[in-house]
Amino acid sequence: MIRSATVLLLLLIAPAYTQPVAVAGFDPHLVTNVYATALAFMVPRTLEPVPVSQLTLWGLHGLTALDPNLITDIKDGKLRLLTHGNLVIERPPLSDTDIDGWAAMASDFAAAAVASSTVVRHAGTQGVVQSFFDELFNHLDPYSRYVAPSDAYEDRERRVGSAGAGLQLVQRGSTILVGSAVSDGPGALAGIRPGDAIISIDGRTVQGKGATAVAQMIAGPEQTTVIVGWRTRDGRVRSAEIERSMVPPETVYAQRAGEMLLVQVTEFNRSTAAHLSRAIEEGLANPHPPEGIVLDLRGNRGGLVRQAVEAADMLLPAGVVAITAGRDPEASRIWRSARGELAGTIPVVVLVDGRTASAAEILAAALADRGRGVVLGSSTLGKGLVQTISPLPDGGELFITWSRVLAPRGWPIQGLGVLPQVCASLGPESLVRQLAELAEGRDPMAPAVTAERALRAPLAPAQVLAIRNACPAAEGRDSDLEAARALIHDPATYAAALLPPLRDRSETTSVVSSPSLISAPKDH
């Protein structure tokens, strides 16, 4: 929750401290650029408007977090930094339109703190920047954050991939094995399969090297080539020249489980929807097609919202998938399905648990609200806020929450989460009773599910707790799959758990109050 504060922007007095002291290990120019880029990105996009002066003052409290002897305050219309009660630097506040000026001032204060404090000096440039954002984001929502350069690189790899062969390597003793291969990655297309052993890269043996080192040998600039030698599981030695490409990690794992097609989606990166579509198409093309699809979203923490919308698109007829609302025009939109139903009317059961979050909740809520799937498991995490990302000059990234998500029936996902139609977290006996009642046409979860769908933001904590207590969040269990099998095997039980479908636009547009939301989604 954003806390208000008053900032005096009155006096135009020459600064008492005009030039930051150059200190080894601290780069004031980089810090200025990072702050300026971040503040310019945040000011028009935060969920609630916050002036740049307030954002900067919050961030400067990071100096106190590093060294409690450093205090930032406002006195006589001037912003001051003190140590042990002694003035270190003071400046007149600036106009809230001067974002670059506030960034430069914050950098000057940081440089003065570095010169005055051994603790801050030891933290260095990265420590000062990290502390600035840590303190700033303490005043915003739980999901807005700064990601340092080292972690940002890993985050980007998860979202968009890295240039390589699309292979995940593992070490078994002295052997480097392929743990998994992205199905449409260059390695898999060259014939490399899980379980094969990598033996050479560009003619150099990998003997004595670990999996990470071998992965680094395979990686390189996009559209360059690497020669990979490997030994297949049946002992044949093969070699191929592979062109490196950007390959996101695999997120979709499909297998036949009796009469069901079980599809696990671990997160949503830029290839998830395409891989999910292929998995469903291949599963349905089997000479003995499955009786139903089980979409396993347990433990899925989310990812790219557009990918979740595209995943919903392949299972839903035309209509609303989700509604997002924010201050930036690009943040407010109605996300729609349009492509048609890839799986026809085949039953769909969606497995969720207390770790299912964000984009995964959007997909689960859409399938449930539109009467296309039965959600089974426990209450999900309840992360109904969407972040937009900006790269920063230090190589880090800024994640800013810029919109709230509403499900197709108009209820907010944030805080509530998705309440399943079949609750598996109340124990095995309760689950058996629910399935038996559904088989007789009675839906024991209907009152709670209906109550959730009727809620509108903002919500009181008591409302949230009352809904979530109907099916407390928990980790998924093996019995979830057996319950899904029971739903798919008995059409009457499955039908009793379904919500009635939203049949036309009028049933969803009533939840939208802002004209800016009535627009088709645009690509990022």
Please tell me what each predicted stretch does.
Residues 40-45, 113, 187-210, 293-296:
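Conserved PDZ fold ligand-binding element
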Residues 131-133, 138-180:
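PDZ/PDZ-like peptide-tail recognition elements
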Residues 139-140, 174-177, 199, 213-253, ...:
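PDZ-domain C-terminal substructure recognizer with occasional recognition of PDZ-binding tails
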Residues 159-163, 171-175, 192-193, 220-224, ...:
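Short flexible coil/turn linkers enriched for glycine and charged/polar residues
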Residues 186-197, 219-221, 288, 366:
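A short glycine-leucine-enriched loop at secondary-structure breakpoints
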